[in-house]
Amino acid sequence: MQLWVGLGNPGPKYAMHRHNVGFMAADVIAEIHDFPPPVKKFQGWLQDGRIGSTRILLLKPGTFMNESGRSVRAALDFYKLAATDVTVFYDELDLAPMKVKVKRGGGAAGHNGIRSMIQHIGDDFRRIRIGIGHPGHKDRVTGHVLGNYHKSEMEPLADLLGAIAAEAEWLAKGDDVRFQSDLALRLQG
């Protein structure tokens, strides 16, 4: 059993923010893999499904981004899972838009949702960093991160999220390298 977490802020006004791409990824994974509807649990929304032969608990914390770790900790404690069983999908400012990198461990790199997770569960969890690009100047970061995706970005974003969901079985199997390479091939073709 694994716990997959999509980071974002709750509420319709945040739904299309770049900062919510983790929520978007979780939604597409749930849709593609026929997860049942979410239930309110662990200060968030939980879906319990399978990807291949692996049971996946898919959690979208209902706390705001800065408190995401509380929701994740509650789920880990209930299911008696470790941080190593966690995969988190989130926006990465310092990665080009529509690029994806997989990483395990490390610091928060200025991301408040990741900082909260590290505070509550430690840093030994897998991260699926989804690039949103840097706006160029630090004064523009907040507006960029908390801004909606532009209309011109919607089709590439849908393609990216669909590809992440389609290749998610490799993540479930623990094959990060195959996930990354097959994702790149799918997005090229």
Swiss-Prot record:
User: Which first-to-last residue range defines the signal peptide?
Assistant: none
Q: Which reaction does it catalyse?
A: an N-acyl-L-alpha-aminoacyl-tRNA + H2O = an N-acyl-L-amino acid + a tRNA + H(+)
What SUPFAM superfamilies would the database entry show?
Peptidyl-tRNA hydrolase-like
Q: Where in the cell is it found?
A: Cytoplasm
Query: Does the keyword Ribosomal protein belong to this entry?
Result: no
Positions bound to tRNA: 14, 64, 66, 112
- Listed GO biological process terms: protein quality control for misfolded or incompletely synthesized proteins; rescue of stalled ribosome
Active site at 19
The EC number of this protein is: 3.1.1.29
Marked site positions, Stabilizes the basic form of H active site to accept a proton: 91
* Marked site (Discriminates between blocked and unblocked aminoacyl-tRNA) residue numbers: 9
Q: Which GO terms describe its molecular function?
A: peptidyl-tRNA hydrolase activity; tRNA binding
Instruction: Kindly state one GO CC term assigned in the UniProt record.
Output: cytoplasm
Q: Which keywords fit this entry according to its UniProt record?
A: Cytoplasm, Hydrolase, RNA-binding, tRNA-binding
Q: Which cysteines are joined by disulfide bonds?
A: none
Entry's family note? Belongs to the PTH family.
**How is the subunit organization of this protein annotated in UniProt?**
Monomer.
Q: Quote the function comment for this protein.
A: Hydrolyzes ribosome-free peptidyl-tRNAs (with 1 or more amino acids incorporated), which drop off the ribosome during protein synthesis, or as a result of ribosome stalling. Catalyzes the release of premature peptidyl moieties from peptidyl-tRNA molecules trapped in stalled 50S ribosomal subunits, and thus maintains levels of free tRNAs and 50S ribosomes.
What is the protein name for this chain? Answer: Peptidyl-tRNA hydrolase
Gene that encodes the chain? pth
